[in-house]
């Protein structure tokens, strides 16, 4: 797991789908105050197209690049795209936001954003990118053991994005067990689960 870098996949077709859903739910739920967004697998939180990880496989070419080059007349998709243009100051797209960046752009300063990342290098980048924001709290712990603590310390409506690397086979069981615990312990909680189907027959 600690060899994983989300930059390899940033902006690919799966990221586009995941972040479109995230932006839709952020806009829908943020009207319920107080509001907290929690990302226990935050990565670096934002990604440069010039970064060596994004350039290795260039997965963004079949993801966000295709979307940006397609004429789309849908208000919900435009909400997602507008945030990408916003972080790029409406200039040439050179930055693709991670979930943390999308949340920061979509939410208000009175909303709270909890970010967690175990990978030391990614955590360093996450802090560098977001620690100047007073409504963002950043931790460097095991995501599964820390998630319930982050939720318990939050007030009001909560949105959680559970998006592990799945490089460790046990991640599948850990996600399901985590959902069971969250469902039993917490109210006013919505969870987005990234759960790749790698083997159709098995899953």
What are these regions (language model features)?
Residues 1-203:
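Class I S-adenosyl-L-methionine-dependent methyltransferase catalytic core
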């Amino acid at each position: 797991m600690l060899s994983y870098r989300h930059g390899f996949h940033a902006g690919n077709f799966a990221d586009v789908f995941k972040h479109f859903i995230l932006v839709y739910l952020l806009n829908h739920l943020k009207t319920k105050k107080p509001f907290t967004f929690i990302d226990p697998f935050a990565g670096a939180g934002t990604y440069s197209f010039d970064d060596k990880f994004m350039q290795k496989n260039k997965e963004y070419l079949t993801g966000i690049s295709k979307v940006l080059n397609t004429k789309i007349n849908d208000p919900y998709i435009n909400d997602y795209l507008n945030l990408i243009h916003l972080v790029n100051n409406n200039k040439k797209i050179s930055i693709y936001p991670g979930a943390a960046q999308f949340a920061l752009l979509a939410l208000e300063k009175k909303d709270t954003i909890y970010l967690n990342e175990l990978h030391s290098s990614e955590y360093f980048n996450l802090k560098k990118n977001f620690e100047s924001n007073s409504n963002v709290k950043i931790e460097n712990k095991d995501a599964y053991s820390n998630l319930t603590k982050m939720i318990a310390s939050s007030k009001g409506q909560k949105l959680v994005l559970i998006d592990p690397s799945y490089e460790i086979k046990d991640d599948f069981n850990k996600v399901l067990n985590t959902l069971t615990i969250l469902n039993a312990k917490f109210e006013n909680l919505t969870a987005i689960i990234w759960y790749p189907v790698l083997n159709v027959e098995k899953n």
